[in-house]
């Protein structure tokens, strides 16, 4: 599984260079745009993502949260699986390229594969990358975060108490900019 993630990560870093830096930084931009990457397939994950997004937005960041701001389900109804994949991929890549920051939630037995690709695209396009982790499974097994993922982050917020993680991020945002 780790090999697959590493291969996916490397392939999409290379592919992201093919997209180029189509979304060059606009001069005079006053709001920092954040692309939120992470698992979003269970209700608990979606609720957590919304809570963390609210914290970022309370600090005046403009957040693209795929589960909230991405392609609406209704627009995908008449599409083939290939068309759905293409639309979702292109929308997310476009939003990453328009963002200044990629904020990646690493919780899960392994980091979400799609979010790893999003991180790789962001990193390859000089986006500032931050991670957040509350999941204890890898710590209990004495496993380190994959260096290819960890190496992308300016900072990794890690606290196995979810509320304390929010407090840590809130303190950081009160004193620093992403």
Give the residues covered by each predicted segment.
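General helical structural elements
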Residues: 6-7, 154
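Bacterial N-terminal signal peptides
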Residues: 8-16
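Conserved catalytic or regulatory cores that recognize and/or transform ribose-phosphate-containing ligands
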Residues: 20-178
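Positively charged n-region of N-terminal signal peptides that target proteins for export
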Residues: 1-4
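Composition-driven detection of intrinsically disordered, low-complexity segments
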Residues: 7-8, 123
């Amino acid at each position: 599984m780790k090999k697959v993630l590493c291969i996916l990560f490397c392939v999409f870093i290379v592919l992201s260079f093919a997209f180029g830096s189509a979304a060059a930084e606009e001069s005079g931009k006053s709001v920092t745009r954040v692309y939120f990457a992470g698992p979003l397939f269970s209700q608990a994950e979606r609720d957590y993502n919304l809570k963390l997004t609210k914290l970022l937005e309370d600090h005046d960041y403009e957040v693209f949260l795929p589960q909230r701001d991405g392609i609406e389900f209704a627009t995908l109804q008449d599409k083939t699986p290939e068309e759905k994949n293409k639309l979702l991929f292109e929308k997310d890549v476009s939003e990453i390229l328009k963002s200044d920051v990629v904020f990646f939630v690493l919780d899960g037995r392994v980091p979400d594969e799609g979010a790893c690709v999003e991180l790789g695209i962001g990193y390859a396009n000089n986006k500032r990358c931050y991670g957040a982790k509350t999941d204890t499974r890898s710590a209990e097994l004495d496993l380190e975060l994959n260096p290819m993922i960890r190496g992308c982050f300016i900072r990794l917020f890690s606290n196995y108490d979810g509320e304390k993680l929010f407090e840590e991020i809130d303190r950081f945002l009160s004193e620093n900019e992403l």
